[in-house]
Swiss-Prot record:
It comes from Homo sapiens (Human). Interacts with GNA11, GNA12 and GNA13. This is Regulator of G-protein signaling 22. Testis-specific. Expressed in Leydig cells and spermatogenic cells from the spermatogonia to spermatid stages (at protein level). GO terms for biological process: negative regulation of signal transduction. SUPFAM superfamilies: Regulator of G-protein signaling, RGS (SSF48097). Residues 1142-1174 form a coiled coil.
Amino acid sequence: MPEKRLTAEPPTITEEEFEDSLATDDFLVDYFNEFLSLPTFSEAIRFNADYGVFEVANDAPQFLEKQLKKILQNQQPRNPIYDVVRKGKNEVKPVQMNAPDEDETINVNYNIMCLSREEGIKWIKKERLPAFLESDCYFEYRLAKLVSQVRWSKSGMNFTVGSNFSPWIVKKPPSLPPPATEEDNLVIMKKFYVSLGEASYTQTKDWFALAKQSQQTVSTFSLPCCVPYNKLKSPAISSVSENFIFDDGVHPRTKKDPSKTNKLISEFEEEEGEEEEVSVSLQDTPSQALLRVYLEKKQDVDESLTMHFSTCEEFLSSYIYFILRGAIQQIVGKPVGETPDYINFNNITKVSFDDCFESIHGKNFLSELVQTTKERSEEIEQTSLSSKNESAGPESRADWCISHRTYDIGNRKEFERFKKFIKGTLGERYWWLWMDIERLKVLKDPGRHQRHLEKMKKCYLVSNGDYYLSAEILSKFKLLDGSQWNEEHLRNIQSEVLKPLLLYWAPRFCVTHSASTKYASAELKFWHLRQAKPRKDIDPFPQMATLLPLRPKSCIPQIPEIQKEEFSLSQPPKSPNKSPEVKTATQKPWKRELLYPGSSKDDVIEKGSKYMSESSKVIHLTSFTDISECLKPQLDRRYAYTEEPRVKTVSDVGALGGSDMENLLQSLYVENRAGFFFTKFCEHSGNKLWKNSVYFWFDLQAYHQLFYQETLQPFKVCKQAQYLFATYVAPSATLDIGLQQEKKKEIYMKIQPPFEDLFDTAEEYILLLLLEPWTKMVKSDQIAYKKVELVEETRQLDSTYFRKLQALHKETFSKKAEDTTCEIGTGILSLSNVSKRTEYWDNVPAEYKHFKFSDLLNNKLEFEHFRQFLETHSSSMDLMCWTDIEQFRRITYRDRNQRKAKSIYIKNKYLNKKYFFGPNSPASLYQQNQVMHLSGGWGKILHEQLDAPVLVEIQKHVQNRLENVWLPLFLASEQFAARQKIKVQMKDIAEELLLQKAEKKIGVWKPVESKWISSSCKIIAFRKALLNPVTSRQFQRFVALKGDLLENGLLFWQEVQKYKDLCHSHCDESVIQKKITTIINCFINSSIPPALQIDIPVEQAQKIIEHRKELGPYVFREAQMTIFGVLFKFWPQFCEFRKNLTDENIMSVLERRQEYNKQKKKLAVLEDEKSGKDGIKQYANTSVPAIKTALLSDSFLGLQPYGRQPTWCYSKYIEALEQERILLKIQEELEKKLFAGLQPLTNFKASSSTMSLKKNMSAHSSQK
């Protein structure tokens, strides 16, 4: 079984190696782009790895993509699957496909602002890199690199973790040797081991002259020695033995040519024949010492030569190349130059590799190989014809790995799948312990350092911790003793914490994505789908969430509701504004997990489905732990009777500071991902109130999360509330936030029992307080950013939709043109193959084979035809690149500014992953690496200018493809032959340039998508409004128009608030129980049907009734949160409604609307009754004569008994419900009157009361 060595030491990014790592490490690009686009920073920046430049975030590519998709949908026929109504045969019409006009052009170019390369790098290193190196983004990047080492193969893999093994060394070009610091004479003296002593100046001078003269012809050595010939390893003596013989310990040696050495040895063998041992004398040395090398008879070491390959494909490609090279050499008659990766299989007798083809019973191995080759070619074609954001999902990578019989975690999306895979397992605990150790290592402040250690103990050591580790694991890590929880010991065990992830969880993840898992039985797949898919509720009244997040996170950024359809594609220097508000969350609980659009979007969010986490635990959130651990409560059902469309309006953006406050909350939410950028600003400011307020906000979020667990723990809630009060609010608090004395007293009076709104006043106070440092930080960051020069660049969108539109456009061409295109297109798949290039020239007629590329340059007319030929086949980039470099070479050296500008232009346009370093590059991968080494390394791609030799080398590769590929295709075309016969046939076939490599699109990081999120300031404002008598009365009338039970829900919420005040008043327990009973009888278990008078799930109501005593003061917690979420949905609509009205007019307008709705319902009921009476009357008239029944139509037959069609109208149903409600209300009032009076009502009998009730009901009905 093959072995693979892994390292437990993650890569370390330094300022010196940052550029090289950013240019070569895709993981680093992903995480650094996520960091740069966080809402903490005033300007959203991203690094474009294709062009090697930092760009200002721009939504123009996504907007263009939507436009192209819309155009394509208009051009293509409608999919019949969407035709719900089945049409008759005569109604079906042939679908007409609207092909685009030939002259129609679609502009796929867009402008984007880029940071100046030199200034941008300096600004990034100064303003962003230090914070990144202390952020969770960097820690997760290091962990991702470690996990990415794991690789799965069918033949098995034995993993070993080594301490002295590091694969993270950045490849750099060989550096020049340092200049000699010693004088030449001193070096010569050391070489010859001489001391001149008291020699005269003349003698010394003559001796040095003689030594220098002898040094020019022969090599030196220290002592003569003998080396047996059989100890010399083939193919060259100079590899090991030469260093041993000639090294004098002072200066290095240069390796001799292996071919010459082999030739020398072979000559010795021929001369000596069968002698057992021979010797040969080499050249004399300056010190006149004789060197003799003793040679023994050479053994045939090639007999057992074994070559090892990592995969079977690698062996096949090498062997096929060896066979083809021999065939080409025999055909051409000339030796073909060797490449570095060439292997001579004549000397190899045995081949071994890690992975091999599995023997499949009943199938032909050759057919299987051919099928695999076809699939791979189709996959390569598909990848080259699709953008990365559409085809580079985790599934496509998984399919690629399976087709190659391997699997690894080699990109960000696979790593996100691995995170999801270990969620809820022991591997997740190892994960977060490793991350917490990383966080601990960067904390410099002693206070924060100690607090983080305490939080880690509570999380991992205490039995009720969120990530509690068993005693066996703690004993293994030597963490059972609390004194061992120190930074030094945690650093020592960090590699041991990582080993379970590398040796078990990561290989297990890879194995689950193997071919056997992919091709599992249909029954197993169906069972897994049913388990993973949430159960659909068949209840006609959908339930609301068990727990609605009143305060999920005070800072979760919103997803904008209003999407602008049109905007300028030219990006201004400033980044887009932040979203103006944050919405309220209604998603399942999740812990320590972030949602990325590029990560779990393809995995979990597909075709509009929302990501719902499976976890139900909650993380104890502090300012020194992962802020993204906040849970959100589970949504089992939605509310009933209140289904309303989402209103595209923003509510009260002025509350608590407006948009600035929302930006502050967004920043606080992602502080851990941003390296606590804002927190450090407050710490360094010297203002203790700012620093304490930030700490309080983080700890307060942890307190809020305790209310969103499935099982509320009153003891933990009480303990956390007391901790917050004692640490931040109390008069003698160590981290006092400066709250007013009245508010402190108010919090103290309500601290027993504590509810989720206990610290609302304190939270509102600190948010307003933190607005000042936030504004100062943003301004200072913008000042530094404005010093960087911005350059506008024009880009071209590479989209699948655009290619499909081009395909539709090509259908209008003639069949002959299509055949020509196909013929030429088939020969461009393998441009680097020598045999293909020979075949290109074989297709050229003999009379045109004398044409060279230089002839085209001299013939301007043919050169223009050649340019059009390349444009026709979307390959004009080669000629453009060659022309631009040629223009650069012809610029005089004196004109330095023009040469510099041209060099920068060439580098920005061609030296990127869209062209020269992409899949359609004119150079091979080895040649690309040689070019980058010549230019100084991959890190140089981030700088402005390249040297002239580099550009000349690039031009050589471009010209090589032009001469060997495109020129023979051009000469073999019919158009060229027709022009040579003076039959001019001009045909312009123009297409847009299609780049072969997809543009990397790393969108601005968004933690959540398609979720209702709301900040704490909106929740506080809404809660205040519900407690305000005037506002609550207006809102009550407003929601009464939206649903039948919404008004009751508002009253229920207010009654629960009164119950909370009653608990804080410390009154008698019997009074509190009586209040609970009253609320239950009125809203949850009413004697008047329906029993449940508010919009909460039935299970929730049953839980309140059955466990009212066990729940204690939190008996109505879940129900109140559910109602709050239902009502909060209509709060933005109400705010929009009352904007244009005065307080005096609001009630009158609402009353008129209510009256209008009633009249509308009455008219609908009357119309339904009238239509029903007419139908019955008509039926009676037509059914009297029995003879006429045969003449009745089918519609009237349907009205006969047992065949009558049931009619149902929603408006009539609503009216009936309203009537029932009124009658029940009248009955309730009468019952109150009956039991209110003593003497007068005791004489009444049941019959009389019943008669009066019926009379009143009938009277009320007649009035209606």
